[in-house]
UniProtKB/Swiss-Prot annotation:
Positions of the UniProt region annotated as Disordered: 1-34, 115-151, 255-297
Compositional bias segments (type: Basic and acidic residues): 259-269
Organism expressing this protein natively: Chlamydomonas reinhardtii (Chlamydomonas smithii)
Name of the protein in question: Ezy-1 protein
Low complexity composition bias: residue spans: 136-150
Biased composition, class Acidic residues, residue ranges: 123-135
Gene encoding the protein: Ezy-1
Length: 297
């Protein structure tokens, strides 16, 4: 599917293009929920990238994402060396990003199928095998829930399919872009998946921004909340830690309470002294209120 990509005054992609196409399909009654969800997802990812570029220090992540996509792209027009990306001015990065992103999303194995539930054109093997494989991986016809969407129509990914979308981004050589894809999904997520709103907290804060160096204090705090007993972090780089947070946040969203209701508060554990306390001897032999009222007494 060719996406509508343009360059605005800031050099970013026209993230409203796909959304306008999806809205037109809604108005005409054309297209299915999965196709509309796919177009909206692409538009939301572009919007997330545009927002990222405008943040303080966002150029560092912006450059890292371009470098990741250049490495993953098989398109001859996208061939660049990592060293040339490092030296690129912001204007050149802005011009290259929309082209790379469109190519990257369209060619990431199984990504579009996770939204549409359909075998992708040109996929290897016959249609029957593709359909079986898609359904076995949780990206078949049940992957998209068309009953609700905060975007106003269209489908939303099931949590199982969403975790697979996030998981495919690392083999595609872009753990950094995985975080942006996570943010792009938020605009479409039904309210029971609101725990995924934790993911934007992974992106650089005021302390320790960028893709290199130590994890931000906010990110480290979030990681420990999601997995209290986690250890062995000293030898891990920041991208690995950010990826772990993204996965844990997605897992948190699919815990049993993710049915649209607030989770039942956990009962506090009594301290050992309270648990082991014996009642006074005179209280042990007192009849209960029910026993006193019994006709047999």
């Amino acid at each position: 599917m060719a996406a509508v990509v343009g360059t605005g005054s800031d050099g970013g992609g026209d993230e409203s293009g796909d959304r306008r196409t999806a809205d037109a399909a809604d108005a005409d009654g054309d297209g299915d929920g999965g196709e509309r969800a796919w177009l909206r997802f692409k538009a939301d990812v572009r919007a997330c990238l545009a927002d990222l570029r405008n943040r303080k220090g966002g150029i560092t992540l912006h450059r890292a994402i371009v470098k990741d996509m250049v490495s993953a792209s098989s398109n001859p027009g996208a061939r660049r060396s990592s060293s040339s990306v490092v030296k690129m001015a912001r204007e050149e990065l802005d011009r290259l990003m929309p082209f790379l992103l469109d190519d990257f999303l369209d060619n990431m194995p199984g990504l579009k199928a996770a939204f549409t539930g359909k075998a992708e054109p040109g996929a290897e093997g016959d249609d029957g095998e593709d359909e079986e494989e898609g359904e076995a991986q949780g990206v078949g016809k049940d992957a998209v829930d068309s009953s609700s969407s905060s975007s106003g129509g269209g489908g939303v990914l099931s949590c199982t399919a969403w975790q697979q979308v996030l998981g495919r981004t690392v083999p595609a050589v872009s753990p950094t872009l995985a975080l942006v894809l996570a943010c792009g999904y938020l605009a479409m997520a039904p309210r029971q998946y609101r725990a995924l709103a934790l993911v934007p907290m992974i992106l650089p804060g005021k302390t320790g921004g960028g893709v290199d160096g130590a994890l931000t204090r906010e990110g480290l705090s979030l990681l420990k909340k999601l997995r209290p007993g986690i250890s062995g972090l000293a030898d891990k780089d920041k991208q690995w830690l950010e990826w772990v947070i993204a996965r844990l946040a997605a897992e948190f969203a699919v815990q049993p309470a993710g049915d649209g209701h607030e989770p039942e508060p956990k009962r506090p554990e009594l301290p050992p002294t309270a648990v082991q306390r014996e009642p006074p001897a005179e209280e042990q032999h007192k009849p209960t209120a029910g026993a006193r009222d019994s006709p047999n007494m």
